[in-house]
Amino acid sequence: MRIIALSDIHGQLPVISESAEVMFICGDIIPLKMQKNYPQSLKWLREEFIPHFNNMSVEQIYLIAGNHDFFFESARPQIISALFSGTKIIYLRNENVDYLDNDGNTWNIFGSPDCHIFGNWAFMYHSNIELEDFNKMHDDCDIMITHDAAYGQNDICKQDIWYNKHEHIGNPEMAEVLKKKHPKFHFTGHLHTSDHNVVDYNGTKTACVSLLDERYHMTYKPLILDIEKSGDYKLVNNENKMGTDA
């Protein structure tokens, strides 16, 4: 099954010409200038985000929110459900869902926006709540999408304009859950300076798929993979930065 994974667009709608069966969007989608404005966020989602992504050459899109997506934390579930009704987009908040691919394989997918606390942002909860949410993931999960990364999982924030040193800033509670549960694939966002390559984390193939760099410039390409139920994969785009051949 060919998939496209991306995250952290912060209102910058990417042009994606490639086609795939499924797309995963791992949060931080709403423009920074309106992130705390509910009416503006709703209008942008309805008039900009949904038409743009609904026109993509994919059959299904799974979306989670990020720590800048305050709308999704405050909106009633009925509002969100109505917003995406009749579109390709399925919104997940600590939920499991099954997807039947074109080859007849069933994929179990889990999505969570939860992040560990480091300021006054959306979806940041104490460790006991995060553990409860992450443990909702089924034991036989195939694909996990989260905004945060687990501690030690592609989570080194490089020294830049925001951080004074290289350090791990991943989620300890997520790491604890992933010691017991091993999804085949895990796609994350949140860290604009993280390594964007696919790496192995305790048997799980994982990648940070944010598109913006630390200065909020569109720098990285969406990740495109051909994935197998066995956990094997083939990288379709060999270069992950803009301006290089896919």
Q: What do the predicted segments below correspond to?
A:
Residues 1-4, 96-111, 139, 143, ...:
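Beta-strand-turn-beta hairpins that frame and shape the catalytic cleft
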Residues 5-7, 23-28, 60-67, 91-94, ...:
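Active-site neighborhood of phospho(di)ester-bond hydrolases with catalytic His/Asp-centered motifs
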Residues 6-102:
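Core catalytic region of metal-dependent phosphoesterases/phosphodiesterases
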Residues 10-15, 30-34, 64-75, 96-101, ...:
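Active-site environment of divalent metal-dependent phosphoester hydrolases
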Residues 17-18, 52-58, 82-86, 137-138, ...:
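Short, conserved loop/helix-junction motifs that constitute active-site signature segments
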Residues 30, 34-45, 140-182:
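Active-site-proximal segments of metal-dependent phosphoesterases and phosphodiesterases across multiple
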Residues 97-103, 176-181, 185, 192-246:
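Binuclear metal-dependent phosphoesterase catalytic core
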Residues 105-143, 163-172:
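Binuclear metal-dependent hydrolase catalytic cores centered on His/Asp/Glu-rich metal-binding motifs
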